[in-house]
């Protein structure tokens, strides 16, 4: 058993080098998430009379805005690591060393899902206003893909040797090389694989959302527009509060890692607010007796 456990370690962030181009696992995982998300969202959108072209037009906007939001959110709380002498970095491209601001090096990690959710939601709101689409219906068909994409994307943390938890001797412990350990834990070798916990949690959320969606289109459960999105907010945030408590690299509001002593873990605070928002949203949706979405394509198939 110990021999099997010892192999649970990252093979490295880089998948392959093609000349001067380095293909990283994180990029591959994001690409896979996007492709699966596009296919799934288009499929679910057909049940709510959302034209596939709408999802296709939205996806690149959503991807870019989410990546920007995720990076901006992270850098905002970690600005000291990118300011001063660390402001500039160099990338190798076509045999050249090109100077760029270090906060643009997203391939080295340093993104926050809450930033992606905030900026992604803003982009969906603006898109739906311009395209005259029903915001809640569009959001409902996207959140299952978001949950699945998070489950896949979290493995990027594994390959980058980041976002791990406290030291542990559990059978599922994760080996972290010395160069990736925080100084205060340099004498420890095995840590909680918090990326794995969140990945599994997100898979469960994805399955729950798909199950509820299917019950809804079959008329077995009343799920007004927006309810699925609120359920996602609540379920994801509940898991994130617990998982974030295990991590030793949190973004802190006051205090400092690994325990944010004298301060708060920002992800836990945001998650708590999202639970409140999602709970209020569900109450409002059912209290106001919002209309059920129109499942035109399903009914057409039954004829």
Swiss-Prot record:
InterPro entries in the record, alphabetically? Lgt
EC number(s) on file: 2.5.1.145
Name a single GO biological process: lipoprotein biosynthetic process
Q: Which UniProt keywords apply?
A: Cell inner membrane, Cell membrane, Membrane, Transferase, Transmembrane, Transmembrane helix
Q: How does it sit in the membrane?
A: Multi-pass membrane protein
Give the protein family: Belongs to the Lgt family.
This chain belongs to the protein called Phosphatidylglycerol--prolipoprotein diacylglyceryl transferase
